[in-house]
Amino acid sequence: MLTHLIEFVYRLLWGDLFTLPVGGGIGISLMVVLLFTAGIWFTLRTRLLPVRLFRDMIAAVCEKNQNKEGLSSFQTLVVSTATRVGMGNLVGVVAAVSAGGAGAVFWMWVTALLGASTSFIESTLAQKYRQPDPLYGGWRGGPAYYLHALAERRRGKKLRHSVTAALFAVSGLICWCGISQVISNSVSSAFQNAFHIPPLTTTLVLTALAALIVLRKNATVKSLDVMVPIMAVCYFVLTVGILVVNFRQLPAVLGRIFAEAFGLRQIAAGGFGTVLMNGVKRGLFSNEAGSGSAPCAAAAAACDDPVKMGFVQALGVLIDTVVICSCTAFLMLLVPQDLTAGLSGMDLLQTAMQYHLGGFGTVFIAATLALFSFSTFLGVLYYARGNVAYLCGDNWWSQTVYKLIALVMLLIGGLQAYTVVWDLGDVGIGLMTIFNMIALYPLSGEAMDALNDYEKRKKLQ
């Protein structure tokens, strides 16, 4: 029954909303419409912010934290990157290429470039409507909190809960349970390929280690400060090295990406919609722009200007998809197609790494993914804190119950089929995006006022 419900909602969100009468028909989903419309609107409204203010984004990340009660700008970027790098950049890209082919990579890029401005808006609002966190200290917030503020403004009175805010919080908790499943499924598959360890064994060990970390009463994300940058740099350096060695083949790979993104063959066969949807879907899973995930971390930053936190998260979207995701995609697309035909998931990525680096490549991906999985799991549980508190109030029992549920999903995910574990996460992130957009459009004017004020002050300096 639950499986059928998840499949039904999945089809509503990611199935064809309408079909354009071109070739074999181009199916366009509700989520494609929402994300592209919002991305184009906010990019135009912010006057191409990712291009105009790129230097300001870099400066915001490097700014030192003078307030010890919250996360620094760098720590906030690290937390959001922890959930993107690994599950998004490795697993998400693999899923996009597996299901949508090389053309899906192009639409991941488009989703990121448009999504950077959306991420700026939502993260700026998260800073503005954040609240003190009596349980963990510092601050908490996110879409549930600015949705609540919007509902109070429209009703003209104080509310204990808002329906849309509560629905966002529930959707987020569902999504992060789904991500927990993807984590264990990917790691167990990678270890089976690299070391021939049964999935059950890997999943049990992974769940036990995760429990030791997250079931502490006040587990922090300080460990991510070192773990995530080191992992990301190691992975980036290795992949760039492979690309340099194969630089003569890169034009052909780029040509294939663009050809399949707009290819007449895909349109004629009715496959363009699949390429587009998988690029957008996995792009959203990777960079989270518009879904409302990253604002949960952005709200916790001790920042003297909400606009600066908007810059930090917008930069995170670009780093994630345009840089790191591209490296992963090129690694796979440099491999002769006859060697990867019929492969999906970690089988595809590890085969690609084995082609480039021999047996070391398979082991490297397995080890890297295992480390990434911990950072991702810590990151999503950090996101969950404020949403659990919004639904259940300030108490430790509700926080612990959600952690236990996430651990159970981690255990279950390692034993399920590859395609099944994605559905719950896709449903959750799709619902999150819908409820988040309900607030972003009416409240975006406040983020724009803050941006205009920032630019005026900048001119006076």
Q: Residue spans of the language-model regions?
A:
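Flexible loop linkers connecting adjacent transmembrane helices
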Residues: 48-73, 95, 101-102, 117-159, ...
